[in-house]
């Protein structure tokens, strides 16, 4: 059985933003087109490096996000408002890692699109849904952190968790609505390059001859899934920064230790969300820029240079890496998550959570009495724990 050869850079048509499914099949009378020749050949070493990188992204991402989700559902103290959104992010990342990333890895050995017309539509829908869940969840989470910083002492309503779950569900629904046109119009198209006597099969959302559609599609994806959400997030964090600067002029006194701790906790979570946003922006920017370059340049086919191929691989790997970095960013930023992550990773029993401080109060009582046989009066102090019966939001910010 003849070994399949990877496609050359000029035989891969990158047709949709954040593309994880595009693939091509080459039919040529020229035997030199069956492999990569000359300086553009990545060689078996480069091919192995690509597959090892994909394998690391998939395995590490699945492990990290699965543990994050397990920590959320098994640890009651972690079931808070910001953690609901972060867990929703983990589900979106898992969806991408289990479907689109393995499919993308088949490009380099497969001779054509392996998953048919239905697979093209389904995978296009999943890919854009996952990207939408990531960026829209970060937007909602930034808005939530802004409210928490501006009103740090405001109590959450009793149904706050339920309302947050509904918001997270709405993010998924909106993401699916935005991804629906991708599923409807995506198809496996065959393209021909008369200069090289070869044909291309690719899962795309438009025929390659429709240059205007490609330009509109790339621009809309860049705006809807990158520029607009990140602009909104930037506004929220500008307001957060201004609020935090003003708060330094009115720091609570030592007697208000609970208020101080709550404010500091919300500041810490705001910084954590900002790190997640920055990771998303950095990981997805090269992929968006590459798609815009393909859409608005006069070239019909991908630049055949080795440098272009390297940048294409780099942009894909960086975009997929965003789906596995969030759990490890949280591990680095949150001691609480770090503790539970280690416990789940090494199959140890997590430490029992401390009892809520806000539900009890320690009261010192003075007791006066007469000592028998002496007639002298002695006063003693005892500590009594009283249950207030009110639930103050004390563990809101765990990650």
Curated annotation (Swiss-Prot):
The keyword Transmembrane applies. GO terms for molecular function: bombesin receptor activity; neuropeptide receptor activity. Residues 64-82, 144-163, 242-272, 334-399 are cytoplasmic. The keyword Transmembrane helix applies. One of its GO terms (cellular component) is plasma membrane. Pfam families: 7tm_1. SMART domains: 7TM_GPCR_Srsx. A lipid is attached at residue 347 (S-palmitoyl cysteine). It comes from the Eukaryota. Role in sperm cell division, maturation, or function. This receptor mediates its action by association with G proteins that activate a phosphatidylinositol-calcium second messenger system. This is Bombesin receptor subtype-3.
């Amino acid at each position: 059985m003849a070994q399949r050869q990877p496609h050359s850079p000029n035989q891969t048509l990158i047709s949709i933003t954040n593309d994880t499914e595009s693939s091509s099949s080459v039919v040529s009378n020229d035997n030199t087109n069956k492999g990569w020749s000359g300086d553009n050949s990545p060689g078996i070493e480069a091919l192995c490096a690509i597959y090892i990188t994909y394998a690391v992204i998939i395995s590490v991402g699945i492990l990290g996000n699965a543990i994050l989700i397990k920590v959320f559902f098994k640890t009651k103290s972690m079931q808070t408002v910001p953690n609901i959104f972060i867990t929703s992010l983990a589900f979106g990342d898992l969806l991408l890692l289990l479907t689109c990333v393995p499919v993308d890895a088949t490009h380099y050995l497969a001779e054509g699109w392996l998953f048919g017309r239905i697979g093209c539509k389904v995978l296009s829908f999943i890919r854009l849904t996952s990207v939408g869940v990531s960026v829209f969840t970060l937007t909602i989470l930034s808005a939530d952190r802004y409210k928490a910083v501006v009103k740090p002492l405001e109590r959450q309503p009793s149904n706050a968790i339920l309302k947050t779950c509904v918001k997270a569900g709405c993010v998924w629904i909106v993401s699916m609505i935005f991804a629906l046109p991708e599923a409807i119009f995506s198809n496996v198209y065959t393209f021909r390059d008369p200069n090289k006597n070869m044909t291309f099969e690719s899962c795309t959302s438009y025929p390659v001859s429709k240059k205007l559609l490609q330009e509109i599609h790339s621009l809309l994806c860049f705006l809807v899934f990158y520029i607009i959400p990140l602009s909104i997030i930037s506004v929220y964090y500008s307001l957060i920064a201004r609020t935090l600067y003003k708060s330094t002029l009115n720091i609570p006194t030592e007697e208000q230790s609970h208020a101080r701790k709550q404010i500091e906790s919300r500041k810490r979570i705001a910084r954590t969300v900002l790190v997640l946003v920055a990771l998303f922006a950095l990981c997805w920017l090269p992929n968006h820029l590459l798609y815009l370059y393909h859409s608005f340049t006069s070239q019909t086919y991908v630049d055949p240079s080795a440098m272009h191929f390297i940048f294409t691989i780099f942009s894909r790997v960086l975009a997929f890496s965003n789906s596995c970095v969030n759990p490890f960013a949280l591990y680095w930023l949150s001691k609480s998550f770090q503790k539970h992550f280690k416990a789940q990773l090494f199959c140890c029993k997590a430490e029992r959570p401390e009892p809520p401080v806000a539900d009890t109060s320690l009261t010192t009582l003075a007791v006066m009495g007469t000592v028998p046989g002496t007639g002298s009066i002695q006063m003693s102090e005892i500590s009594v724990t009283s249950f207030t019966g009110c639930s103050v939001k004390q563990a809101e910010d765990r990650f």
